[in-house]
């Protein structure tokens, strides 16, 4: 948690003033019992109403000034805590956006979401409470003990005994509950994961009638979380009665010994009442300190989790200072004995892949499920770094390109058609921020999306809901293809991005791409043989290895894997067409 305190930079003044005003409030609070003692010993004893009213006015003033100090302290602590969480959340968001797919796969989306929301909130609460209580509570305890000694040294010893005993009880309860709270946080992560998976896969869950099974899984984890929280709650519930019992014994001691000293004239009745008030103040301060410890413990646990994210360094480094020669026209892509293994996997996803895609060629990639097709094309824009070998674009290793230049060269259409909340125009401009109307319309036309966009009353200004939920699967895919085309990239990668299109639309799309993207090197990943049949070169993958390279005709003669795929999907006449 200490390492996160750097995010309080810029709020040094608030971080100083918040505890200062809390200590001022505590000072006024410590004076109040003495005023009460004077009212009893002088005003009431002498039946001096003027004196009583005078002291009451002083009490009111002390209360008002204390309240003002408290409100000012609350303002400064809240401002500092909110500034802290805002800076931390921004840094986390920026840091996560720099992580490669490897780190994102390792950390997991649900965990990252929990950390940037719940854990940041826990850290914010911890900072807020520390600024308000970390000096105030000890100040009250020490101040009350000192005040008790100024009234009577022997009764002050009762305070010296009671405070450590209450502190030990609080420490014991906190030491027991803190690990339980940490365990509860892990269950909360699991709940977040299940909830997210169920929400994202809601259609699949309902399609297979798995609602009861999903509910059962969620209920089990939720019940475990509840049990842990209840267990922590039961132990924490001992805090108030245990400390109250100790305090009551201390008060009994004060009253018993105080009454004896009152009877002999050493103490006054007002002073005994003041001592009881100081004991109550100590108890309240220690309980507040216990709550602070709980909040700080949760904040520290969250701090560890947040530091885990911040300490995760991106495995891909951006050669931001490199200056590469811009090549006009389509790009040449070369794979030189490329192998790749996912983090944590024992088996390579790709093994010894070598091929050359000449400028302007269309490369089809086909193979069985899980054979490494998507992995291969993800290496071109450098979403992952190769384990061995080289990926070369226009004579330069992809590692030598600045990310901005490399991503500008490559237009990526991912397997999952992801659209963002906003208008269709907004989504198109992801491909090119200053795209003109003509460029957008051309991209939509090639992607076979102009028809349905024009049919919308608002056209390009039609609102797209989060994830494109208000569009069909085929419409989403066509818009993501158009988005990639708007930027007029040198390399276009379509990763099984036409799977939701009917055969006629798919054929029209392939024809448009072939005719109107002469200046691009195109990679088409597909499960459909018809989608890659006309490609200049076809790569056939089998269990991460290159089973064949060539044209459709060449592979039908030389590659058994490709022949089996084609014959399983097409008739003999369609194969030879």
Give the location of each predicted region.
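An intracellular "coupling" helix at the cytosolic face of ABC transporter transmembrane type-1 domains
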Residues: 10-13, 98-102, 118-127, 131, ...
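Membrane-integrated ABC transporters
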Residues: 1-29, 36, 44-58, 65, ...
